[in-house]
Amino acid sequence: MNPGPSAAIDDELWALVLGLQRHAAVAGAAPTEPVAYRLEPRWGLSPLQPDEHRGAVLIQDPDGRWRCGPALAKGRRAAARPLLRLYLPLFSTTLAPGWTVAHLGQSLDGCIATHSGDSCFVTGVENIRHLHRMRALADAVIVGAGTVVSDDPRLTTRLVPGPSPVRVIIDPMRRLADHYRVFQDGAAETLLCCSHEHAGARVRHGQAEVVPVATKAGSLDLIGLKSELRGRGLRRLFVEGGGVTVSRFVAAGAVDRLQVTVAPVLIGQGRPGIVLPRVSSLSEALRAPAQVVAMGEDTCYELDLGTARSRPDANSGSKSESKSGSI
């Protein structure tokens, strides 16, 4: 598959996001008053004087959050504003210690692949390009062993400008052979995370480093895994799949933002996306602030799970007045 040019965000605006990434890496605390910035072709973000705010592409508020400036309100740039809202929160000072974003692409009936595991590709070119951008913004991209077997992914940023992240493969029992591309191509640093029991004496798996992680209830302790990665300076984590891995991260409360991109296709009895423990009533369901972004023919739903966990009424929602469904 060869994704074509993106209609939603062009090279100039992606350069803006990468400029913000460089700026955030060296910036200090949030400003005491709003600060507006323009994009300099050679130098990245440059602050503006208060009387120049009309030309601002980005504004940082005293709460540390970023928003689109007036210069992105009209013309072709305006079409990119919804998509930029997926990226701007990642540079907020409230997420400065690090963030974990999980993503799944699925069919309208909730499947990420056919029953045989064919998943290339459920979503369209816009979402594939978005995945590569998210990799470029992350320190590490995380996938489970099932994704490696089904897709043999490279997990690089070959479709967009930007650095490829460290590749983290979760394989608790170390069952994967070492012939997959992530273990052999040398395109990026790669970590194979498994249990202490299965780490063995070998410290390498192909070209990947073997990293033993504590287990919990038969699976890797994901909070412990995140701690191990933080100790290596990997604080911005992108969990790219598959359904089992993303579901476990969500169930463990280890995800700040969850992105689910839905394609207008019906797969039938395929492999499910998010699978969480059962709840008895809708009042127990996880409800979170959300935004919706169009990606070509697909629709991306992003849930702010970090905010949902911090709200005492996060799981409360409207209930029907009767069992008949009347409201």
Language-model features: where?
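Enzymes that bind and transform nitrogen-containing heteroaromatic metabolites
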Residues: 1-327
